[in-house]
């Protein structure tokens, strides 16, 4: 029975699924925005919220190195920690994008919310 079990399987084995999410998490932290399917974006958001929350604590460095790909350096983590500092949660946003042409899968943009930068919609509202 599937009681109190969260997470999606994505038709992959556990090690493949973890590797896929680890790579996507690294890309998200480096680029601050990725485009993927809606299901993967929602799953990655759950994982990334916990990881970004841990970047604020300097004693969590060893834990973070085990959960993140090797191409993420300390400078990147400090930049993420500065974004996460004023908040307790809600570091990420999932924006629905439409459907992919090839297989009609629902697509989404997953991005890190930066309080200093304003989105196009917010800047349009201020102009009006």
Label every model-predicted segment.
Residues 1-12, 16-19, 23-128:
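Structured, basic alpha/beta domains of bacterial-type, RNA-associated proteins
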């Amino acid at each position: 029975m599937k009681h109190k079990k969260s997470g999606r399987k994505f038709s992959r084995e556990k090690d493949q699924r973890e590797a896929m999410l680890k790579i996507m998490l690294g890309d998200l932290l480096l680029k601050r925005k990725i485009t993927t399917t809606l299901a993967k974006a929602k799953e990655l958001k759950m994982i990334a919220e916990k990881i970004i929350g841990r970047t604020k604590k300097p004693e969590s460095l060893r834990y973070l190195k085990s959960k993140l790909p090797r191409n993420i350096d300390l400078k990147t983590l400090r930049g993420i920690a500065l974004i996460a500092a004023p908040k307790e949660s809600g570091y990420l946003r999932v924006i629905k994008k439409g459907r992919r042409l090839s297989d009609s899968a629902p697509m989404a943009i997953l991005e890190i919310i930066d309080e200093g930068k304003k989105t196009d919609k917010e800047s349009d509202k201020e102009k009006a």
